[in-house]
Amino acid sequence: MSVLIDEKSHRSSGSTRSRIVVTVVGVLLMVSGLAVMLGHQSGSANEALGMEYEKPSVEVLDLEATEVEQLTKLGLSPKPKLKIVKGGDEQVLHGRFLHITDMHPDKYYKTGADVGSLCHSGKGSAGKYGDAVLGCDSPMVLMEDTLKWVKENLKDKIDFVVWTGDNVRHDNDRRYPRTESNIFDMNQRVSELMYETFKEENPRGGRPRQLKIPLVPSLGNNDVFPHNLFSPGPTLQTRELFKIWHDFVPAAQLHIFNRGAYFFKEIIPNELAVLSINTLYLFQSNPLVDNCDRKKDPGHKLFEWLGYTLKEMRARNMKVWLSGHVPPNEKNYDISCLRKYIVWMHEYRDVIIGGLYGHMNIDHFIPLDSKEAYKSIKNKFGKLGFDYELSFENDLYVSDDDDNSDSDSDDDDEDTSLEESYSNFNSPILKDGFEDSVNFKNMDDIRIQGGVPNGKVGYMENVRKEYYANVKGKKKSGYVSERYSIAHVTASVVPTFNSGLRVWEYNITGLQNLLTSDNQPRFAPWNEFFEGLEKLMETQVEADYDDEFITFGQQVEIFKNDNTFPPKMPKSKSLGPAYIPQAFTPERYVQYYADLANINRGEKEFSYEFEYATDDKVYDMDSLTVDDWISLARRLGKPVKEKKNKSNKKSKKKKKNKDKRLLENSEPLKQDGSKDSRLEQDRVQQSARLENLWQHYLKYSFVSSEYENMGMG
């Protein structure tokens, strides 16, 4: 429990909020400090605090020939494993994990039914395993055989599973209305199937129920009743969810979980964790919550939990993945939630590896711009004293005379705003003031989802225009693109397109030395942290920004004490695995898909097959750091950016001058061709290559279903 520390002193060291924190956990803070300090002292000192420490033994295991063959067949990297033994517990690390999402099993699905009836009745062409693009949910056999394939092919090759929700069918057939009982039952059924898939076949220590590898679920918008609507806890839903997920959620986090269905799971003790975030509290389509700035709303409490948890992870020198169902973007999150989410990722870039999400069924990635987020915060809170120094160009980033061949010129980069992005995604900002808001903001809040996908190519073109083409050059992004963080959205099992699964590979080189170091700090047990955290979360602040008779001075004081805004990352901290290659840095991933059309025709046995890998000749990514993703974003967005710049005479002039400088030392054409024609030829070839890259990206976004060629918008 090394850090229940108030880090808001950079705004108000003597504030009421600070005094409350110290009063609640003052004694815990003293023990916390001792835990860190004594980490490098003698063992007897640690034992005196009840923190016995046993150094694990770590053994490198070479692969057998059959293992190499299996991995190669799956397109995975054959690399040595690590066997960790501590306190009688054994863990084998492969440097891989699985991300699975959006199974949407439908017990009413009938093979041969009419797709117009959502495959529930009539006579038609509904395939045994479901059909891409036709709009039905998953047959039960698709979910069952998917998990059977995972068990047979991946279970013994991965370290953990990230499972990002939507385990219930869509509520889109009035003939078969969903009830709360139905939803609990299906969640229970899917959870039991997941447990059976990943359980330890030979449990140790007489424990009858034991997972072979950790599994981290998160709550989907269709896992609740009614869909999208989720109240602040504790509620019947949070209590039932804890019962359903009792194999996955640590018992010590029961009280925190009951507040809002968020928790975290240690993957490698004191080294790596996955945070499960209830994104329904950030979701614009949840009409039971308003925003993430009002203290009475659950989104505000979620960010309190996130802040305290990340501080503890930093103090323990742990690294984390964030996971959740709904990805952070302008279509999904309330602006007050999105900007906070982005700046927390930015200020904990020494800790956070990345974010893993589902919900959208489209395989793509989203660059999150910290400068845009901070500008948006200033727009709202500047009058209350928000004066965060945006020193990106002068502090984190490269100098004007730095020349980097991977960068587009920053000269044509215009600063954009988060507010503009909401407008461009046709996602209006319905509330971002301090006044009271009304629930059920528009009918989109209760819209029915699922069905035939329409307009998804248009969405991806907007992603290209608003995200990729607006990525800044190196001078404004940083040596390793520190300005940005990345949200990864993976393909779903439900056949919105073809079914998809993703296996990530990450760096475990050097982990052996890290785990066996004599300088490993000792920490108090996690249950002490949770006890202190519960007390902090129970602390209520009466005044809120939108209280009826609130004064401006009181609003200023509330903002000073608002700990849902992160402190700046300490300059003493180094960038983490997301930015600099080290232990836990993502190296590559392999995407698998089920070719449903050929499987349903009987031309293939049911199986998932290799679709692509990030290091293949299409993407050609050496690793998966943020800088690698930003480089890919620049390539994907460059044609759009150049088209935009051509309409700017000043930009064209700068481009011409740059071309002249590039040609000063080039050799003349051997025949009668001019330098201008040579440049034009190069541009045409590059444009063709980039367009080919975009077409491949669209193909993979829609999971090789040919959706991008179907004319569905």
Curated annotation (Swiss-Prot):
GO terms for cellular component: cytosol; fungal-type vacuole membrane; nucleus. Its cofactor is a divalent metal cation. Residues 660-683 have a biased composition (Basic and acidic residues). GO terms for molecular function: endopolyphosphatase activity; exopolyphosphatase activity; phosphoric diester hydrolase activity. This is Endopolyphosphatase. One of its GO terms (biological process) is polyphosphate catabolic process. It holds the Pfam family Metallophos. The gene is PPN1. It is an enzyme of class 3 (hydrolase). Glycans are attached at N507, N645.
